[in-house]
Amino acid sequence: MPKSIIVPAGTHKPIAPFSPGTLADGIVYVSGTLPFDKNNDVVHVGDAGAQTRHVLETIKSVIETAGGTMEDVTMNHIFVTDWANYQAVNAVYAEYFPGDKPARYCILCGLVKPDALVEIATVAHIGKK
């Protein structure tokens, strides 16, 4: 099964050995996405809603670069550092998935940088385009 590496224009260089996304058999796998700028610094420190929006916009750019849309998302893996931010994360998340909701789970955990409040990894089925 051949795969394609998906790297949207302007994407920051990952801080570890991974690609922002891969496409194989019409499925886009988006790596865990953190609220980082192009220098791998955390953006919107202390604002879980703004960090969630930044993360989802980054995920959207990976999926669109692969030829899909957010409507193609079938699964999200969400990681948060504090349950107090859960409502803010969900409020922004709902804006990106207004219709049929993809499957998901949410885990409370520490993240790679202390100021990062949310990380999301995504799977989207875009078909053979």
UniProtKB/Swiss-Prot annotation:
Q: Report a single Gene Ontology molecular function.
A: deaminase activity
Cellular component, GO, one term: cytosol
Q: Which Pfam families match?
A: Ribonuc_L-PSP
What the entry lists under HAMAP family is as follows: RutC
Q: Which reaction does it catalyse?
A: (Z)-3-aminoacrylate + H2O + H(+) = 3-oxopropanoate + NH4(+)
The alphabetical list of record keywords is: Hydrolase
Signal peptide position in this chain? none
According to its UniProt record, which protein family does this protein belong to? Answer: Belongs to the RutC family.
EC number(s)?
A: 3.5.-.-
Which residue spans adopt a coiled-coil conformation according to this UniProt entry? none
From the record, give the cysteines joined by S-S bonds: none
In Swiss-Prot or TrEMBL terms, this protein is called: 3-aminoacrylate deaminase RutC
BP GO terms, sorted:
nitrogen utilization; uracil catabolic process
As for what it does, the entry says: Involved in pyrimidine catabolism. Catalyzes the deamination of 3-aminoacrylate to malonic semialdehyde, a reaction that can also occur spontaneously. RutC may facilitate the reaction and modulate the metabolic fitness, rather than catalyzing essential functions.
Q: Which CDD domains match?
A: YjgF_YER057c_UK114_family
What domain of life does the native source organism fall in? Answer: Bacteria
Q: Which organism is it from?
A: Rhizobium rhizogenes (strain K84 / ATCC BAA-868) (Agrobacterium radiobacter)
